[in-house]
Amino acid sequence: MQCSWKAVILLALVSIAIQYTAIRTFTAKPFHICPVPNPLNCGLGQDVESFDRMCDEYPYFNYNSSRKTHILILATTRSGSSFVGQLFNQHSDVFYLFEPLYHVQTTLIPHLSPSRYAVERRVMLGASRDLLRSLYNCDLYFLESYIKPQPANHTTDKLFRRGASKALCSMPVCDAFSPNDGNIEEGDCVRKCASLNLTLATESCRERRHVAIKTVRIPEVNDLKALIEDPRLNLKVIQLVRDPRGILSSRIETFRDTYRLWRIWRATGRKPYNLDLTQLTTVCDDFLNSVSTGLSRPPWLRGRYMLVRYEDLARNPLQKTKEVYEFLGLSLEKGVVDWIHNNTRGNNDVSAKHKYGTLRDSAANAESWRLKLSHDIVDYTQTVCQHILDELGYKAVNSPEELKNMSISLIEDKTFIPFL
């Protein structure tokens, strides 16, 4: 009973915080009642011009779907999403943000359970959708409610992984680098650029035709339905999936404390009695729910959803990138092609030691988990994740010898055609 009362009080406090954030956002800006044009008339210049004149003071309408394509990379931790994010970050007309929902999570739910209890999940998703809507409309001031300490004069040095966004390390946001500098290292950006001015960041966002956001904090595409159905956002979702066995292996190597019991199992061959199995089952359940929705082709996902396997991208990065860009209606720039050539061939010692690195031998990395996981862990994973493994075309192994035989691929040739 005592825990129940604590849960009720916590939910009430979080709800008040969200409402306060929303009210403060509305009251901080002038309110306009703007007539929304009929989408069928978007090609009629006079109507659109009149609409813009009436609403030019209101950024939500001033940066609508007639001008921008918005992209969301829907992924889970250690699935290759940082690599995919760079495919958009390198495009000169894309404003890219790396995990802005991190701030929502750390502010509202500092102790979010890996199993994502229903109450916490609803709170997190509601706030996340509100923030995404604002960011896609280049309202970066909305972030200030979640950044701690709160920015002063719209300036902060606490934006998570600011250096992972090329737009936030370039003019007009930062003048430390010239346009000819090419690839800007994340650490160099953080060291050489001054604190982030959100007003200049907003200006940079509005100058670009596309906004791309990467997140591992939205469990399923179903959770994005309200945003996808909003015609003003013109949102398209790239769902990135990876073999759950590879995800588990990467997490064991990267998050050593959190996955300590998995490491014990791998080393001793004995499964700890108190192992948190939700660290595996949550990934498979979320994948299955989301992919099942996407592949069932509901009307609200027509032209809005593309499923991409990390392994396909790793084995043929340029061809897969071309397919993704074609689906999104983006031109494949030379800078993106050059980045792919430079960052998917051969090992990179510096990046290999960094848990969030994107420079790697992508083809070799796709199935390297087979040399790191024990067969008993793999066998258990195949049992609890059988349905999603079958759905995505990942083959099971039946012996330690088969697991370590790298001459036999565990990835079926399977094509996932976008729903157009």
UniProtKB/Swiss-Prot annotation:
One term of GO molecular function: keratan sulfotransferase activity
Protein's membrane topology: Single-pass type II membrane protein
Alphabetical keyword list: Carbohydrate metabolism, Glycoprotein, Golgi apparatus, Membrane, Signal-anchor, Transferase, Transmembrane, Transmembrane helix
Binding site for 3'-phosphoadenylyl sulfate: 77-83, 242-250
A single cellular component GO annotation: Golgi membrane
Glycosylation sites: 64, 153, 197, 342, 405
Biological role stated in the UniProt entry: Sulfotransferase that utilizes 3'-phospho-5'-adenylyl sulfate (PAPS) as sulfonate donor to catalyze the transfer of sulfate to position 6 of galactose (Gal) residues of keratan.
Name of the protein in question: Carbohydrate sulfotransferase 1
